[in-house]
């Protein structure tokens, strides 16, 4: 039989059972620690016991289920609101797989990143460059969608934080500042300026919060300003990231458009040598169309680049186009039908060249839409006059199209027709230019070329007015002096 070698005192055992496991208590509403204060051993023990109590309370299976249900509902509400916005105001985005994929990739990536950082305590959430979201969406899409996507993502990320209000306010303001300060991105210096402005907005707003909640400037949390600085530096990586996203999702940024619009580009240089008249027409058009697009809130850099490349197909048969002819007209040896086919082929030839030189789809769209589904009217009318009794097949004289389906394409079509027609005016007076612009654009409107694009009558009136002013300046119009009556 084994006998115990050590027996505790009954008195000690009885007394020890009365000893409390706690070594202090915290009253309801009592302040544990203030921002900027040093954590001593006593405070650490209180905070640690608070953490354990939270974990204990969250261990309940029922509570976990309810928490999960609440999170799913929370996420679902904001995703529904964002998709409703797209349906109401950007329904065309549903037809672009790359657009939706990019938006939802951002919506998934940033909340997941935030959750990992908070759960693993990797670093402060404020080093994450959330302002990169509106920059990316603004560059590839539009500012309104950029703001909506940014707010949605910030609200989804805030679910991972215990005290999200300060986070939400800081990030929403920083996003608004980023959108406003970066209306277009064509140079690296623009992004540097935006990163600086975003850092300043973070710092000023956080400083305002501290002034509101603190009564002692010595307690300011300087570490947060270091986080904001790191955030601004990381924001600069948006520039190389844009190139990667372009390739993955099939977008075209202003940076790429600026590079393409360089007239030393091999394709444009070749056009200036092979079809110099067409090249000069494209340059004039680029300035005219870009100014008009900017006036009505369109993408001026996109229109400028599209204008430079819209007629590259004329390089295949340059002599068949009047601006490249020098006294000899090769159409005289062709029938009207054959001539029409040669003229129409500059669209298909242009698309082939664009494909060969890897031009973006948005530029190819300008090539295919700048004549829409219009007729080669000169040859069609000439053929019709020679064969008045014949039922003419219009498709032989019609461009393949389609008609313009964006505001920028509509502006390009108007600029193309007006600039080309203005060269044939017998005299350049204010009246002749005004009449020409009105006649050409009113005819395009009446024939339904712009029915499929989101351009308004107000936009068209603005474009007409700008074209008149620009053409008057280009051709140095003079006032027509009245004749003296006898």
Predicted features along the sequence, with ranges:
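Single conserved hydrophobic/aromatic residue that forms the stacking wall/gate
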Residues: 1-8, 13
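Hydrophobic alpha-helical transmembrane segments
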Residues: 10, 14-26, 42-53, 120, ...
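Non-cytosolic juxtamembrane linkers/loops
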Residues: 17-112, 120, 130
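Charge-dense polyanion-binding interfaces
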Residues: 60-77, 161-177, 432-461
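Generic detector of multi-pass transmembrane helix bundles and their immediately adjacent loops
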Residues: 88-283
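A glycine-rich phosphate-binding loop feature that marks nucleotide/adenosyl-phosphate handling sites
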Residues: 193-200, 222, 226-227, 262-263, ...
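In a subset of proteins, long, contiguous C-terminal domains/tails are tracked
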Residues: 214-218, 222, 240, 245-249, ...
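Divalent metal-dependent catalytic cores for phosphoryl transfer on phosphate-bearing substrates
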Residues: 263-430, 434, 443-447
């Amino acid at each position: 039989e084994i006998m115990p070698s050590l027996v505790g005192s009954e008195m000690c055992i009885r007394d020890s059972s009365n000893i409390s496991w706690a070594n202090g208590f915290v009253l309801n509403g009592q302040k544990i620690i203030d921002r900027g204060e040093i954590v001593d051993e006593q405070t650490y023990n209180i905070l640690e016991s608070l953490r354990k109590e939270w974990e204990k309370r969250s261990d309940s299976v029922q509570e976990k289920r309810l928490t999960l249900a609440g999170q799913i509902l929370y996420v679902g509400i904001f995703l529904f609101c964002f998709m409703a916005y797209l349906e109401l105001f950007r329904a065309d985005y549903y037809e672009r797989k790359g657009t939706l994929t990019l938006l939802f990739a951002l919506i998934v990536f940033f909340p997941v990143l935030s959750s990992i950082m908070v759960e693993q305590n990797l670093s402060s959430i404020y080093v994450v460059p959330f302002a990169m979201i509106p920059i990316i969406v603004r560059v590839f899409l539009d500012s309104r969608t950029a703001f909506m996507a940014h707010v949605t993502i910030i609200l989804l990320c805030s679910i991972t934080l215990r005290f999200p209000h300060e986070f939400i306010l800081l990030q929403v303001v920083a996003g608004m500042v980023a959108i406003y300060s970066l209306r277009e991105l064509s140079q690296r210096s623009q992004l540097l300026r935006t990163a600086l402005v975003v850092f300043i907005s973070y710092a000023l707003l956080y400083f305002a919060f501290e002034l509101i909640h603190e009564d002692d400037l010595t307690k300011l949390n300087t570490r947060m300003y270091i986080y904001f600085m790191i955030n601004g530096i990381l924001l600069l990586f948006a520039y190389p990231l844009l190139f990667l996203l372009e390739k993955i999702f099939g977008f075209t940024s202003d940076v790429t458009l600026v590079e393409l619009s360089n007239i030393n580009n091999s394709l444009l240089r070749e056009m200036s040598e092979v079809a110099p008249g067409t090249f000069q027409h494209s340059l004039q058009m680029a300035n005219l169309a870009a100014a008009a697009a900017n006036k009505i809130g369109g993408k001026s850099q996109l229109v400028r680049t599209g204008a430079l490349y819209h007629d590259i197909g004329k390089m295949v048969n340059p002599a068949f186009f009047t601006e490249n002819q020098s006294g000899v007209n090769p159409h005289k040896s062709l029938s009207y039908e054959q001539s029409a086919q040669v003229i129409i082929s500059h669209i298909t030839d242009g698309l082939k060249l664009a494909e060969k030189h890897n031009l973006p789809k948005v530029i190819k769209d300008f090539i295919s839409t700048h004549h829409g589904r219009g007729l080669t009217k000169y040859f069609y009318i000439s053929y019709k006059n020679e064969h008045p009794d014949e039922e003419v097949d219009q498709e032989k004289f019609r461009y393949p199209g389609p008609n313009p389906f964006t505001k920028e394409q509509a502006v390009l079509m108007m600029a193309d027709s007006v600039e080309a027609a203005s060269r044939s005016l017998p005299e350049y007076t204010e009246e002749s230019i005004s009449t020409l612009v009105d006649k050409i654009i009113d005819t395009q409107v009446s024939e339904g070329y712009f029915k499929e694009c989101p351009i308004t009558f107000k936009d068209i009136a603005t474009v007409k007015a700008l074209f008149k002013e620009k053409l008057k300046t280009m051709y140095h119009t003079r006032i027509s002096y009245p004749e003296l009556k006898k």
